[in-house]
């Protein structure tokens, strides 16, 4: 019998999968818990050095929010790495299509997570600004940068 070897990097293999497992300073943890408690999710910008848990924190915060408000697994989240696709095409195609698509199971807050947003081109930033202004009622944008 062959044993399956997990070849993922250590940080991926042991990444926290629950919001409560994330280690944060008490003030920031309280602020993020209040987002869930008060059902008031703002647009977010996380910045800091690589490997400090920004992406993990946002993903788990959104998952917890969706779990509490019965929106989990309804296709309400898109996560893109802006350093992979830095141009305006990713905004026009993927994000624009996502924000304009109706949800299959009724209502719910949609989330756009953009990692390494500081590497986006100027044109892509302007297109993104337009989307934020147009869809701020029912879409939340979470930006991560170094």
Residue ranges of predicted features:
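P-loop/Walker A NTP-binding region and its immediately flanking N-terminal helices
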Residues: 1-146
């Amino acid at each position: 019998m062959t044993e399956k070897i997990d070849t993922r990097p250590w940080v991926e293999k042991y990444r926290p999968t629950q919001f409560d497992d994330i280690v944060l300073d008490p003030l920031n943890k309280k602020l993020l818990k209040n987002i869930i408690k008060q059902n008031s999710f703002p647009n977010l910008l996380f910045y800091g050095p690589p490997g400090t848990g920004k992406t993990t924190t946002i993903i788990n915060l959104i998952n917890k929010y969706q779990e509490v408000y019965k929106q989990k697994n309804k296709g309400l989240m898109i996560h893109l790495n802006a350093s992979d696709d830095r141009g305006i095409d990713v905004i026009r195609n993927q994000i624009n299509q996502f924000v304009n698509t109706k949800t299959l199971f009724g209502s719910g807050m949609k989330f756009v997570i953009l990692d390494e947003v500081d590497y986006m081109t100027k044109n892509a930033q302007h297109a993104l600004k337009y989307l934020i202004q147009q869809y701020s009622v029912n879409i939340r944008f979470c930006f991560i940068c170094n």
